[in-house]
């Protein structure tokens, strides 16, 4: 009778929630933002995992830091300068992981010297990209502390900024990598060789056309702290590639 009176008074559309629904609503009320944050974290983990699984393994890393950019843009349908330079490096690099292809990470940094900045500022219709230079300078400083990019091509300005002292330098002595009796190489110091004196420069038009003659060829010191187990292999590959470039 009581139930009938309720139906007459309030109608028959009254819905009684199940205990499970009530618990879910209560949970959502108190833990809504926790749940959203957890879901976001799960999505990030899944996306990063997929990217890591699909990312192509790198066989060799090369660093280039200079005020002379190597364009990645095609001009009149031609192969971009960046791709042409990488194609040259491909001749010296081995397929480290044995997957049938060579994947070279050629990372470039735009770093101007004070003289180059002054020259650009005094040239009509030209301006210095300070934002790019600032971000690249920060990235380069961080990169010099990592053992992935051992083989480096740098401007004289960058070299002087990071060379340090003979007792504490980011670069390793380079004289031991040249063929014995080779007197054609021009050493900027015990740690650097002028690019235009190397077979790499002389025998490859793509290098001559896109990298300044006074670029310096260097190799970083071997890292022993904060590096992966494959660090020894990476350094050995960098040494082998350097020898090939100097003795072609």
For each of these PLM feature ranges, what is it?
Residues 120-122, 129-194:
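Extracytoplasmic "Venus flytrap"/periplasmic binding protein-like
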Residues 77-80, 95-126, 130, 183:
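Acidic, glycine-anchored loop motifs typical of Ca2+
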Residues 10-22:
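Short, membrane-interfacial amphipathic segments enriched in basic
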Residues 1-5:
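N-terminal targeting leaders characterized by basic, low-complexity, disordered sequences
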Residues 55-67:
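Alpha-helical transmembrane signal-anchor/signal-peptide segments
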Residues 196-248:
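Bilobed periplasmic-binding protein/Venus flytrap-like ligand-binding cleft at the lobe interface
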